[in-house]
C-alpha cells in the first residue's frame, strides 16, 4: 500500500506539466500585446509627446521582463518538478537550463519581480500629474516590500548555503 501511494504521489508531479505548457500560451498572449503596442506607436508617433513615447517604451520593457520571467518559470519549474528537458543535442540550448534549483529559481523570480516593479514605479513617477498622491505612496510601499523580500530571500539562501558548505 505504501509503495502504491508513493508511486501515485510521485506521478502526480505530471499534473504540473499542462500548467507549464499553459504558460507558453500566456507568453503568446504577451507577445501579441507587445506587438499591438509596437504597431500602435507607429500609427501615432508623429503626434505623440516624448513623455508618452517613453511611457509606452517602458511598457514594452515591462512586457519583455514579464516574458522572460514566464520563460524562466516555465522551463525551470518543469525541470525541477516534472522531468528533465532532453535538449542535449540542441545547439541553441539555454546555458542556464538544468542549473537552476528551486532556491535559485526563487531568487531569480524575486529579482525579476523587483525589476518589473521598478519599471512600473518609473512609469508612475513619469505620470505623477495623473495619479493621486496616496496611490503613489502605495506603489512605493509595495515596491519597497518587493525589494526587502527579495533581499531577505537572497540573504537567507546565502546563510543556508554557507551553513551547508564545509569551512
Curated annotation (Swiss-Prot):
Cellular component terms (Gene Ontology): plasma membrane
Keyword Transmembrane: yes
Record's keyword terms, sorted: Cell membrane, Membrane, Transmembrane, Transmembrane helix
Membrane topology summary: Multi-pass membrane protein
InterPro entries registered for this protein in UniProt: UPF0114, UPF0114_bac
Family: Belongs to the UPF0114 family.
Protein's name in the database: UPF0114 protein Tola_1474
Lineage: Bacteria, Pseudomonadati, Pseudomonadota, Gammaproteobacteria, Aeromonadales
Amino acid at each position: 500500500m505504501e509503495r502504491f501511494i508513493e508511486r501515485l504521489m510521485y506521478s502526480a508531479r505530471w499534473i504540473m506539466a499542462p500548467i507549464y505548457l499553459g504558460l507558453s500560451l500566456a507568453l503568446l498572449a504577451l507577445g501579441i500585446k507587445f506587438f499591438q503596442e509596437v504597431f500602435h506607436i507607429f500609427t501615432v508617433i508623429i503626434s505623440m509627446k516624448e513623455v508618452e513615447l517613453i511611457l509606452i517604451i517602458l511598457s514594452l520593457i515591462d512586457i519583455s521582463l514579464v516574458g522572460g520571467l514566464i520563460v524562466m518559470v516555465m522551463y525551470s519549474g518543469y525541470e525541477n518538478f516534472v522531468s528533465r528537458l532532453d535538449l542535449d543535442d540542441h545547439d541553441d540550448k539555454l546555458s542556464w537550463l538544468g542549473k537552476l534549483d528551486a532556491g535559485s529559481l526563487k531568487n531569480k523570480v524575486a529579482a525579476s519581480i523587483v525589476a518589473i516593479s521598478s519599471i512600473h514605479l518609473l512609469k508612475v513617477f513619469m505620470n505623477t500629474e495623473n495619479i493621486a498622491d496616496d496611490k503613489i505612496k502605495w506603489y512605493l510601499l509595495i515596491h519597497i516590500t518587493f525589494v526587502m523580500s527579495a533581499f531577505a530571500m537572497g540573504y537567507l539562501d546565502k546563510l543556508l548555503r554557507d551553513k551547508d558548505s564545509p569551512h
